[in-house]
């Protein structure tokens, strides 16, 4: 409904547009134990902003809302673009099952399946095991492997340092991210993900980098996050 309203009423309005919604929703599925077809959902949309800035603003908003009602949660943030790049090395018929195993944290089944299809070498399990900055360091190594030799025009760390310095020096809201001299492809996406993490630090939001966060729906293709709160999940 929010995007329908934007398309019909707000397309010509100045960008970025910040919209929010709150209401009951329904899942189109059969009744089953422990899962309700009707549920309440609150959300926001930031349309027309730059990726790292918009993503950091939305995550910081979620953190602020939780804190305002007394919820202290741990934020885990991941990047599906890298996971999908790794899965591109695997036959298409195996990808849905692998995504489901990652989502459900069925590590033993995932390990067995990767062994059976001869894909235990692609670095997926190692990446999922890493958390925090170590996960991002390993992700950058994987990006270099995906790109192959001689395809890098600028080191990831150089752009990351530039983004980090800018994030510390300027206020997060409304700033333009430093994206000078980048190449198109997996590296650019990972650079933007690192910028998002740096911007969250500038907002004062603590987060854990966790590439084990995945979503099965196809429109989830970039940064994803979850907030875990004791007693809530």
Where are these regions (language model features)?
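Positively charged, Gly/Ser-enriched RNA/tRNA-binding surfaces
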Residues: 1-72, 113-233
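Cytochrome P450
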Residues: 72-78
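Short, solvent-exposed helix-helix connector turns and helix-capping sites enriched
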Residues: 79, 106-109, 135
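Acidic, His- and aromatic-enriched active-site or binding-groove loops in soluble protein domains
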Residues: 91-114, 119, 229-232
């Amino acid at each position: 409904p929010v995007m329908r309203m934007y398309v019909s009423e707000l397309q010509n309005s100045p960008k970025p547009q910040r919209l929010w919604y709150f209401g009951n929703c329904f899942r189109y599925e059969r009744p089953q134990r422990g899962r309700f077809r009707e549920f309440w959902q609150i959300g926001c949309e930031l349309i027309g902003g730059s990726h790292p800035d918009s993503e950091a603003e939305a995550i910081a908003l979620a953190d602020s809302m939780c804190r305002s009602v007394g919820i202290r949660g741990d934020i885990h943030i991941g990047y599906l673009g890298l996971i999908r790049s790794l899965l591109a090395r695997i036959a298409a018929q195996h990808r849905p099952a692998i995504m489901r195993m990652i989502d459900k944290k069925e590590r033993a089944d995932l390990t067995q399946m990767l062994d059976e299809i001869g894909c235990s070498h692609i670095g997926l399990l190692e990446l999922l095991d890493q958390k925090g900055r170590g996960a991002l360091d390993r992700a950058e190594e994987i990006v270099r492997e995906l790109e192959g030799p001689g395809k890098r025009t600028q080191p990831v760390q150089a752009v990351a340092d530039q983004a980090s310095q800018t994030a510390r020096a300027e206020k997060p809201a409304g700033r333009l991210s430093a994206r000078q001299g980048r190449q198109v492809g997996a590296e650019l996406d990972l650079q933007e993900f690192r910028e998002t993490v740096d911007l969250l630090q500038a907002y004062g939001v603590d987060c854990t980098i966790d590439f084990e966060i995945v979503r099965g729906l196809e429109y989830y293709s970039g940064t994803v996050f979850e907030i875990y709160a004791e007693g809530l999940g």
